From Swiss-Prot:
Hydrolyzes the cell wall of E.faecalis and M.lysodeikticus. May play an important role in cell wall growth and cell separation. PROSITE patterns: LYSM. One of its GO terms (biological process) is killing of cells of another organism. It comes from Enterococcus faecalis (strain ATCC 700802 / V583). Residues 118-132 have a biased composition (Polar residues). Its main location: secreted. Residues 1-28, 51-132, 335-360, 409-429 are annotated as: Disordered. This is Autolysin. GO terms for molecular function: amidase activity; hydrolase activity, acting on glycosyl bonds; lytic endotransglycosylase activity. It is an enzyme of class 3 (hydrolase). Residues 361-404, 429-472, 497-540, 565-608, 631-674, 693-736 form the LysM domain.
């Protein structure tokens, strides 16, 4: 009778009181405004993140969905967008945690067996949940990690191939003891030196750590685990097992998997950098190369490259970009010292813009300044500004003091023969890499090119290590660059002609002055880009016995008269390495083999020397075409400078020089010079008939990737399509030629 007289509410409360702690520890989905959820750990649509309570929760706690914030870091999971979910995960699965003992009927958005009633709104306190891990396999060719993950549970019969990581997050309430600014400062301390040493963006790594770890609130990212990026496996034998979603046999299941356990955040950042720099599924081709600073124009190119590779979430780059923008993380993309250690340090005693004999001239950056604007103002190249001030990109700050002119005694470039750093005649000079060093920084410090540093030390990329000993100057018997002792501007029979670079010089300007191609200048002097220094001595004409250009008649590698010489690419090869090996320019290798970027493959056969009858570029006098006549060509739809240069056996640099082309933009119907006669001089005029080559954006595409694919610069793609930023959309049609 007493039971019948009880009201519905009383009966409900009585039922709730009967629940055991084990029942309350069933998997629940927790979203709150204090919880930032990264969709990196979810396949396309955000999946629920399960949490197990460590103590009995209030009987009427209500689980609320978190609204999407302006930064786009929180998304409400929906069952409609869960990819391939033919059967919703339930807590009676054989792969759930041991505490999940009863069946459940909830969908993936609420995988708990029963939600508490809404009579009370008591929130779940911080630290009361031991969160589960959300995990996703990157979109990549099948491969395993360099460090195999330990064996998991016995029921793990299906192995999901992982390219890099299974991005795992565990979530609890955001810690009230650490503010976002404090967390950012802690990340910056680790990210800055590691990113700088590995040619990565500190801003992108920090944003990844924030998004992946929920601002350090995940159990996986907290002590004693310190795993900010959810990398699976073990680290120095240490791992921690946590629950993660896996899509096996057509259904989403929760499995216990091992995740790496680090001594501190520093090791977590180092490990992630290692992943971004070394992951490869084909010899010589690095999966995340599109996120490296040297291959991008801004952090946005890097985040776009990671989308669809590091994470399947199509909005991954937007989430990272939002965090970077909202918290000004780009401020950490410059060296932590804030000054130049390459081309000469800032002298506090000299006034900005005060040019004194023997000293540097400085300029203090004002609002609205850019490197291009400052370079034009002082008549120097952007490359020089970067070199003198240790700047790797275009980021400068208001109030920053820059070197804008080098004094007579401040030359760090060229071929100085001083005895610094124990440089002895006939022997090499060595340098031991310190924390924060990069190849660009060391090259600027010792006045050599990055290409020479790579060649002298057998480095194929940009990865160097603290404590590594590098050759930074070659002894008298081993000089391979442009620092030979010859009379400057003194052309002698049988010897090279040298030129000492002055302030304001560029490779294009010098090439035009001496009637040679930019490609030849690069090849003769071991220059891989456009970076030159005031005071640097370079070869501008090769003597009769010193030709190392693209048409030298060496007999190596089965070179036969009148035929091309081929080389089969081996693992670890790069275009720079091959060009140095065969004494040709990278530009020629690209032109002869129709390569638009730097991507080559092990086993690929490429032309490394052009035969006498194959139209190879004469690197001594590239403008010498017998008969005194100029050959012209009318561009057809689909043509590119690389394609035309390969067709006519000339360099892209020559095509640009002969036709006044500054970038890669050409038009169908345009007539250009493809061979110069002895007396030819004028530039061909161009028409405005645009070609119709277009590309429809797919998942994972980026402006950098399209530029590599179609042999066109990022700036040209933006110009053709009226893009002001780097954001492109799936399904968008872009002009690419």
């Amino acid at each position: 009778m007493k039971k019948e007289s009880m009201s519905r509410i009383e009966r409900r409360k009585a039922q709730q009181r009967k629940k055991t702690p084990v029942q309350w520890k069933k998997s629940t989905t927790l979203f709150s405004s204090a919880l930032i959820v990264s969709s990196v750990g979810t396949p396309v649509a955000l999946l629920p993140v399960t949490a197990e309570a460590t103590e009995e929760q209030p009987t009427n706690a209500e689980v609320a969905q978190a609204p999407t914030t302006e930064t786009g870091l929180v998304e409400t999971p929906t069952t409609e967008t869960t990819p391939g979910t033919t059967e919703q995960p339930t807590t009676d699965s054989s792969t759930t945690t041991e505490s999940t003992t009863e069946s459940s009927k909830e969908t993936p958005t609420t995988p708990s067996t029963e939600q508490p009633t809404a009579d009370s709104t008591t929130p779940v306190e911080s630290g009361t949940t031991d969160s589960s891990v959300a995990e996703i396999t990157p979109v990549a060719p099948s491969a395993t990690e360099s460090e195999a993950a330990p064996a998991v549970t016995p029921d793990d019969e299906v192995k999901v191939p992982e390219a890099r990581v299974a991005s795992a997050q565990t979530f609890s309430a955001l810690s009230p003891t650490q503010s976002p600014s404090e967390f950012i400062a802690e990340l910056a301390r680790c990210a800055q030196p590691i990113a700088q040493a590995n040619d990565l963006y500190a801003s992108v790594m920090m944003a990844q750590a924030i998004v992946e770890s929920g601002w350090g609130a995940s159990t996986l990212s907290k002590a004693p685990n310190y795993n900010l990026f959810g990398i699976k496996g073990s680290y120095n034998g240490q791992s921690v097992y946590m629950d993660t979603w896996e899509y096996l046999n057509g259904k989403w299941l929760v499995k216990k998997e091992p995740f790496r356990k680090y001594p501190s955040y520093m090791e977590s950042f180092q490990d992630n950098a290692h992943v971004l720099k070394t992951t490869s599924f084909q010899a010589g081709v690095y999966y995340y190369a599109g996120a490296w600073k040297s291959n991008t124009s801004s952090y946005r190119d890097a985040t776009a490259w990671l989308t669809g590779r590091y994470a399947t979430d199509p909005s991954y780059n937007a989430k990272l970009n939002n965090v970077i923008t909202a918290y000004n993380l780009t401020q950490y993309d410059t060296p932590s010292s804030g000054g130049n250690t390459g081309g000469g340090t800032v002298n506090p005693g000299t006034g900005g813009s005060n040019n004194q004999s023997g000293t540097n001239t400085y300029y203090t950056v004002k609002s609205g300044d850019t490197l291009n604007k400052i370079a034009a103002q002082y008549g120097v190249s952007v490359a020089n500004l970067r070199s003198w001030n240790g700047i790797s990109g275009d980021l400068i700050f208001v109030g920053q003091k820059l070197i804008v002119k080098k004094g007579a005694s401040g030359n760090t470039g060229g071929s100085g023969s001083g005895g610094s750093n124990n440089n002895q005649s006939g022997t090499n000079t060595y340098y031991t890499v310190k924390s924060g060093d990069t190849l660009n920084k060391i090259a600027a410090q010792y006045g050599v090119s990055v290409a020479n540093l790579r060649s002298w030390n057998g480095i194929s990329g940009d990865l160097i290590f603290v404590g590594q000993k590098l050759i930074v100057k070659k002894g008298a018997s081993g000089n391979t660059g442009g620092s030979n002792n010859g009379g400057s501007n003194n052309n002698q029979s049988g010897t090279n002609t040298y030129y000492t670079i002055k302030s304001g010089d560029t490779l294009n300007k010098i090439a035009a002055q001496y009637g040679v191609s930019v490609a030849n200048l690069r090849s003769w002097n071991g220059i891989s880009g456009d970076l030159i220094f005031a005071g640097q001595k370079i070869i501008v004409k090769k003597g009769t016995s010193g030709n190392t250009g693209g048409s030298s008649n060496g007999g190596s590698n089965n070179n036969q008269s009148g035929t091309n010489t081929y080389y089969t690419i081996k693992s670890g090869d790069t275009l720079n390495k091959i060009s140095a090996q065969f004494g040709v320019s990278v530009a020629n290798l690209q032109a002869w083999n129709n390569i638009s970027g730097s991507l080559i493959f092990a086993g690929q056969k490429i032309i490394v020397k052009k035969g006498a009858n194959s139209g190879s570029t004469n690197t001594n006098k590239p403008t010498n075409n017998g008969g005194g006549a100029t050959t012209s060509y009318t561009i057809k739809s689909g043509d590119t400078l690389n394609k035309i240069s390969a067709q006519f056996g000339v360099s892209v640099a020559n095509l640009r020089s002969w036709n006044g082309i500054k970038g890669d933009l050409i038009f169908a119907g345009q007539t250009i010079i493809v061979k110069k006669g002895a007396s030819a001089g004028g530039n061909a005029s161009s028409t405005n008939s645009a070609s119709g080559k277009r590309h429809t954006v797919k998942s994972g595409d980026s402006l950098w990737g399209l530029s590599m694919q179609y042999g066109i610069s990022i700036q040209k793609i933006k110009q053709l399509n009226g893009l002001s930023g780097d954001t492109i959309y799936i399904g968008q049609t872009l002009k690419v030629g």
